[in-house]
A protein has these predicted regions:
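Non-transmembrane, aqueous-exposed alpha-helical and coiled segments at domain scale
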Residues: 2-453
């Protein structure tokens, strides 16, 4: 591309250094001015930025007047996630559509409401004429999140009421995006797989009679075949990733951008940009890569001493990516347990058995047991560290033959539901733009004419 510089030149390096020298701040200033930088305070509470009825997270109880860690709890619209998932699993139903209804409308649907809602979503599950050919197939990229963002922003051009932020219109847009996100994600991967990796191209139309999870597997696989267990566990994964409070980075982004009065497509694209970040949406990829390295370095996967030595090497920055982290362990809110991981684990074991991956599952289980103790000893952390949902989700996606390029888009397919609910909530309750304050710590300077500098 003429005029578009693709290389970092020495000039760019030099200018970057000037930027760093004049932008770096003394870390002690954050403590001086009691600035939390959007993080947890000394009492473990987040910086309170708003109110929500959509979901809540509980990781502590008050016992004898003292706040103590407890088993993690997650509620969708006031319903415990354990009870929600057990409800549809016990009745051998897929839960994506039911929980989507709950998060958007604040109540559980009855049989007729759920049946009608499924028909509504299925009816929205189509893209504009030639969209796949003209938008997705042209200029495919190696990053599916960027392709997904581009597709969402392009859909703006096909919507004659794109800028209308009335509640019925925003709901229409959100339901349409929820319905087409699986298509956008899978088709983007198929384009990448064909045009960049040179593999065969498969474009399968979704089946309106099937659930979201079933359609993802149908569209992704050349033979369109899948087992009931595969579809069930993918559906469960999507439900567990749908929502996690208004304070997570991408959902807060949705609130902030929505408060400006912008259109739905721009708000969702902004949330996608947030989720793409490896500190938010890419953790499960790191877990899979870490275990791949572990399997190469550890000769006996059943030897706790050898596995423990590898985990200590991770913390000492001597193994894998040398970042000093055991990926999939620990969470910003949960300490004793992540309820999503607890729900997930039993089904992971069933899928591992079906796929002949019992030894792999045993290794994951061993790491889950050893890591908290080792982290506590090495880092002197005694508040509690446990496996989070990312610890098992990457393993599940790998067993489902989902390519790593689709790991974060799977997160987006689920979280678009939560983003939509929060966008509606912001529009219903707020009419002010979110504008947090920043403390200026730069001293005033005297202006000098150009010839005197």
């Amino acid at each position: 591309m003429a005029g578009f510089k693709l290389k970092v030149t020495p000039e760019m390096e030099s200018l970057t250094q000037v930027c760093v020298e004049n932008s770096k701040m003394d870390p002690s200033l954050y403590g001086k001015y009691d600035v939390k930088r959007g993080l947890r305070d000394v009492n473990g509470k987040g910086v309170l930025a708003g109110l929500t009825q959509i979901s809540s997270i509980c990781s502590t109880d008050v016992v004898d007047g003292k706040t103590v860690p407890c088993e993690g709890r997650l509620y969708y619209r006031g319903y415990d996630i354990h009870e929600l998932t057990q409800g549809f699993l016990r009745e051998q139903r897929f839960g994506f559509e039911e929980v989507t209804y709950l998060l958007l409308f604040g109540k559980l649907p009855n049989e007729k409401e759920l049946a009608d809602f499924k028909v509504l979503l299925a009816g929205q599950r189509s893209l504009p004429k030639n969209f796949v050919r003209d938008v997705i197939m042209k200029a495919p990229t190696k990053d599916m999140m960027n392709t997904l963002s581009r597709s969402v922003l392009t859909l703006y051009a096909y919507d004659h009421n794109a800028d209308d932020t009335s509640l019925p219109n925003v709901l229409r847009q959100c339901l349409n995006l929820i319905s087409v996100f699986p298509m956008l994600s899978v088709y983007s991967y198929q384009a990448y797989n064909h045009y960049i990796k040179g593999k065969s191209l498969y474009i399968h139309n979704p089946d309106p009679k099937l659930s979201v999870a079933e359609n993802i597997l149908l569209m992704l696989r050349p033979d369109m075949q899948y087992t009931q267990l595969e579809a069930t566990i993918l559906d469960l994964a999507l439900v567990l990733h749908m929502e996690h409070g208004g304070g997570n980075n991408s959902t807060f982004t949705t609130h902030v951008v929505t408060s400006s009065g912008t259109d739905t497509y721009s708000a969702v694209a902004a949330a996608l940009g947030s989720l793409k970040g490896p500190k938010h949406g890419g953790a499960n990829i790191k877990v899979v890569q870490m275990f791949k390295d572990m399997k190469k370095q550890v000769k006996d996967w059943t030897d706790e001493e050898e596995v423990g030595a590898y985990l200590r090497a991770l913390l000492h920055k001597e193994a894998f990516d040398k970042k000093g982290l055991i990926y999939g362990m620990g969470h910003a809110v949960y300490s004793i347990s992540d309820p999503r991981a607890e729900i997930f684990k039993g089904f992971v074991q069933k899928l591992a058995h079906e796929k002949g991956k019992d030894k792999d599952f045993a290794l994951y289980s061993m790491v889950e047991q050893l890591a908290p103790k080792i982290i506590g000893e090495e880092r002197h952390i005694y508040k509690g560290v446990s496996a989070n949902v990312d610890f098992y989700s990457g393993f599940v996606y790998s067993m489902l033959d989902l390519p790593t390029e689709l790991f974060t888009p799977m997160f987006a397919i689920a979280r678009i539901v939560g983003w939509s609910a929060h966008r509606m909530e912001e529009l219903i309750n707020m009419d002010k733009i979110i504008r947090p304050a920043y403390k200026t710590v730069k001293k005033e300077e005297i202006y000098r004419p150009l010839e005197e500098r």
